């Protein structure tokens, strides 16, 4: 894989039910060698350490998958190296992970060993309220997301009656034939999008990297994509075809937005106001919906506009949380001895090699 072909996903995001983590997807003790679980506070160098280690592996042309942070897309929450058989993850809140097979498979790397407690204790009265305000910002974002999801779910419910199931079933039958003979493998669960810092993010480049053929479901109401992708997932599961299931980031795990079949080089993806695909070479799946009566469509449009406004509000709350988180990180950065982080890095590289 070349440097430009980076595979990027998320394994958690703010949803209508709060933060839902999918980080157990990283555990594969029977087929991989090691899961490194990083513990420590903000600014303790967890993401930077992962970037340093993954860069060494990337330079060796290893096959890597990067898991980004929904609340700070420039940071890593985890990465997987399929060639070395290792994964590394930030195991702190909100995606707490602990070893299941301590030492034998997973191991804790304690970044707190690299900081000076007394420096942090001196700033206790600043750290505690700042941490609490950040939590409140995320709670407010969740409130907005929950309200937006309720409106989008309502639209999906009212538009279900207008889905052309014959067209859906015909497409699935044709695609299933193309998938026959594809590699069998386990189901992977991922996210490609998230409500993030001041905007929604969508890793459409991952679809481009993993796909030769991209089928697009144009679906602002959600019902057509829900019907098609749910049934396609069911059929692919019966055939035990390797698939990467990507959920709607605010309705995880209730709604599927994209399915990637990596061995076949085929993706079926949903295009809407939250994730648009730019490539004109994509194959649009036509005629999935019957006309919706104007009065119903008018009301659903109001719902969609309000949902967009609420998502924008959630993005602003997350942006505020990120700015405050930067302030919080500064306290920990000042307390860190990064020469100790260098020692941790060197030990990990020795073990991997």
Task: Show which residues each predicted segment covers.
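N-terminal pre-Walker A segment at the start of P-loop NTPase domains
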Residues: 1-27, 166-207
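Conserved nucleotide-sensing/catalytic segment adjacent to the nucleotide-binding pocket
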Residues: 2-20, 55-119, 125-126, 236-315
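Charged, compositionally biased non-catalytic regions
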Residues: 21, 29-33, 41
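Glycine-rich phosphate-binding P-loop
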Residues: 35-54, 203-204, 210-236
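A cross-family "folded-core" feature that marks the main globular domain of proteins
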Residues: 38-39, 49-52, 57, 65-70, ...
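An accessory alpha-helical subdomain
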Residues: 126-180, 302, 306-342
């Amino acid at each position: 894989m070349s440097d430009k072909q980076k595979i990027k996903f998320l394994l958690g995001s703010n949803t209508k039910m709060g933060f839902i983590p999918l980080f157990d997807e990283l555990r594969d003790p029977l087929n991989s060698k090691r899961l490194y679980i990083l513990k420590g506070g903000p600014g303790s160098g967890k993401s930077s350490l992962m970037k340093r280690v993954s860069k060494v592996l990337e330079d060796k042309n290893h096959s890597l998958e990067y898991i980004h942070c929904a609340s700070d897309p420039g940071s890593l929450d985890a990465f997987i190296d399929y060639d070395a058989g290792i994964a590394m993850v930030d195991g702190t809140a909100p995606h707490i992970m602990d070893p299941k097979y301590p030492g034998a498979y997973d191991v804790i790397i304690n970044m707190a060993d690299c900081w000076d407690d007394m420096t942090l204790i001196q700033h206790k009265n600043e750290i505690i309220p700042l941490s609490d305000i950040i939590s409140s910002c995320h709670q407010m974002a969740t409130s907005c997301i929950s309200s937006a999801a309720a409106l989008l779910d309502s639209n999906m419910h009212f538009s279900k009656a207008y889905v052309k199931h014959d067209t859906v079933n015909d497409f699935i039958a044709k695609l299933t034939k193309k998938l026959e003979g594809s590699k069998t493998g386990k189901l992977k669960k991922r996210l490609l999008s998230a409500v993030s810092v001041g905007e929604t993010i969508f890793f459409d480049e991952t679809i481009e990297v993993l796909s030769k053929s991209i089928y697009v479901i144009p679906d602002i109401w959600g019902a057509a994509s829900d019907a098609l992708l749910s049934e396609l997932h069911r059929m692919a599961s019966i055939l035990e075809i390797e698939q990467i299931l990507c959920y709607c980031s605010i309705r995880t795990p209730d709604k599927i937005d994209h399915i990637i079949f990596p061995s076949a080089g085929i993706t079926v993806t949903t295009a809407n106001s939250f994730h648009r695909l730019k490539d004109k070479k994509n194959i649009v799946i036509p005629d999935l919906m019957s006309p919706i009566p104007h009065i119903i469509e008018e009301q659903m449009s109001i719902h969609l506009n309000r949902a967009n406004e609420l998502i924008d509000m959630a993005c602003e709350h997350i942006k505020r949380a990120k700015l405050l988180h930067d302030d919080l990180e500064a306290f920990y950065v000042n307390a860190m001895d990064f020469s100790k982080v260098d020692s941790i890095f060197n030990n990990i590289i020795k073990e991997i090699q």
